């Protein structure tokens, strides 16, 4: 579903596990999340190799009011990176809907519970939507033709 929004995915060149196939899958997943949450405005997703310069203390962060997610990608399986993207994009949806006021607690509570639940749902729905998308669960690209 194209609502005229622009999405940008940036993958750190130091993340050597991202070949063209995984980069394409990641871009497809970001658009899948945007369509299914939904996200109504332009957004950016950064997958980075270093936490500190990007303000990440755990595995990911959402920048409230900027529609920007930053995901730590070093030494993580693709499915875990995608789950983090879906989690932070759920916060993006909450932000667009005006549901975020102030700080979001790190564990528990409405915002985190919804983000965790939606992330799991989006991963499963994406993997089931096309055969080659099941490759998100693999270390190698076993589903390419």
Regions from the PLM with identified roles:
Residues 79-83, 95-121, 131:
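Post-HEXXH active-site segment of zinc metalloproteases
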């Amino acid at each position: 579903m194209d609502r005229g929004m622009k999405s940008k995915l940036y993958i750190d060149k130091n993340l050597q596990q991202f070949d063209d196939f995984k980069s394409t899958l990641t871009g497809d997943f970001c658009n899948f999340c945007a369509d299914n949450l939904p996200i109504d405005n332009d957004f950016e997703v950064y997958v980075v190799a270093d936490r500190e310069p990007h303000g990440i203390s755990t595995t990911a962060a959402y920048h409230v009011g900027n529609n920007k997610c930053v995901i730590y990608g070093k030494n993580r399986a693709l499915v875990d990176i995608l789950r983090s993207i879906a989690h932070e994009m759920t916060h993006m949806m909450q932000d667009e809907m005006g549901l975020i006021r102030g700080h979001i607690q790190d564990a528990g509570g409405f915002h985190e519970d919804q983000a965790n639940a939606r992330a799991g749902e989006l991963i499963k729905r994406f993997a089931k939507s096309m055969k080659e998308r099941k490759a998100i669960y693999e270390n190698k690209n076993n589903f390419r033709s």
